UniProtKB/Swiss-Prot annotation:
A Pfam match: Polyketide_cyc2
Alphabetical list of CDD domains matching this protein: PYR_PYL_RCAR_like
Motif annotated as Gate loop, chain positions: 107-111
The name this protein goes by in its record: Abscisic acid receptor PYL4
Keywords: Abscisic acid signaling pathway, Cell membrane, Cytoplasm, Disulfide bond, Membrane, Nucleus, Protein phosphatase inhibitor, Receptor, Vacuole
Motif Latch loop, residue numbers: 137-139
Intracellular or extracellular location(s): Cytoplasm; Nucleus; Cell membrane; Vacuole
UniProt: abscisate binding residues: 81, 111-116, 138-144, 160
Organism whose genome encodes this protein: Arabidopsis thaliana
């Protein structure tokens, strides 16, 4: 099950705003998040007057440890992000904050490459965050946060939120629509991979 939530304040004009109502909406839809302060802490963003913000939630029928083993790999995002064709770590070791990676995008998208910095990698709270700091693309000042939360029903709830500058010639709604599609596809791919891995592990244990 996947849901997209875009707070109205995130696409309005004016000074920088915070969007804590995003978390309230998440907690209403997914009660397990109301018991997890990580969601409120990491998915409250400051949004500038020429920026937009959105978030996507994905439920995955797999243990949080299985999902995290894929998500935490800053050096291998193409494992589930199928719009990426390659990734090279160009600074640091890819496993510590401050590491840099350069990713190359598949043809057909309005981008060629992106240089990204690892801002958060928290194995205890299951949080990873990165910022785009360069490259050949139109998504300037893109910042993403992904958190994983245990769910008694599905196994894992993944929340991915982002803030990004609106490119010249585009509206905030158009920008969010475009990025939401990419994030949604990534999380659906992540769900498929994690669920297949979990099923294989369960099958091996039953032998």
């Amino acid at each position: 099950m996947l849901a997209v939530h875009r707070p109205s304040s995130a696409v309005s004009d004016g000074d920088s705003v915070q969007i804590p109502m995003m978390i309230a909406s998440f907690q209403k839809r997914f009660p397990s998040l109301s018991r997890d302060s990580t969601a409120a802490r990491f998915h409250t963003h400051e949004v500038g007057p020429n920026q937009c913000c959105s978030a996507v939630i994905q439920e995955i029928s797999a243990p949080i440890s299985t999902v995290w083993s894929v998500v935490r790999r800053f050096d291998n995002p193409q494992a589930y992000k199928h719009f990426l064709k390659s990734c090279s770590v160009i600074g640091g070791d890819g496993d510590n904050v401050g590491s840099l990676r350069q990713v190359h995008v598949v043809s057909g998208l309005p981008a060629a490459s992106s240089t990204e910095r690892l801002d958060i990698l928290d194995d205890e709270r299951h949080v990873i965050s990165f910022s785009v700091v360069g490259g050949d693309h139109r998504l300037s000042n893109y910042r993403s946060v992904t958190t994983l939360h245990p769910s008694p029903i599905s196994g894992t709830v993944v929340v991915e939120s982002y803030v990004v500058d609106v490119p010249p010639g585009n509206t905030k709604e158009e920008t969010c629509d475009f990025v939401d599609v990419i994030v949604r596809c990534n999380l659906q791919s992540l769900a498929k991979i994690a669920e297949n891995t979990a099923a294989e592990s369960k099958k091996k244990m039953s032998l």
